[in-house]
Design a protein with these regions (language model features):
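Extracytosolic ligand-binding ectodomains
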Residues: 1-142
Length: 142
């Protein structure tokens, strides 16, 4: 990236969500300043659910949760919410239907599903500024 920024200093670089990691900042240094990312989970969000999740995760594991960890956490939350709603009627079709009708508010934001079962999710846009990930903007996946 250093060479790219030397050749094209005015072009904004947009990374993909899996690039969102503290390791990128450590390895990239100044070369990654200003790079933007769409992310499904932003650990520095001011959302109280996110703050509590990050605090509890750090206490237990000694580091911040990754986006994949947050997605797994919300996936479990979606499943358990559906099962709790159904009570004793917990066959797989009933669970699937309960999940399909749900709008779940989790640490990765709102999760819901369209008629095809595809997830509808908003992304948060972040950038690297002074060696830290900071919020650029929040928005939809459109």
């Amino acid at each position: 990236m250093r060479q790219y920024k030397e050749i094209n200093p005015d072009i904004r670089i947009v990374g993909f969500s899996n690039s969102y990691s503290e390791e990128l900042i450590k390895l990239g240094g100044e070369a990654v300043e200003g790079v933007a990312f769409p992310v499904i989970f932003f650990s520095k969000s001011d959302d109280p659910k996110v703050q509590e999740f990050v605090k509890n995760f750090k206490t237990k594991f000694g580091s911040e949760p990754s986006a994949l960890t947050a997605q797994a956490y919300d996936s479990a939350g979606i499943y358990f919410t559906a099962v709790e709603k159904l009570g004793s009627d917990q066959d797989s079709a009933a669970v699937r239907d309960a999940i399909a009708e749900m709008s779940y508010e989790g640490v990765t934001g709102t999760t819901k599903f369209d008629a095809n079962g595809d997830v509808e999710k908003s992304f948060t846009k972040v950038t690297i500024k002074d060696g830290e990930f900071v919020l650029l903007e929040s928005g939809s996946n459109e």
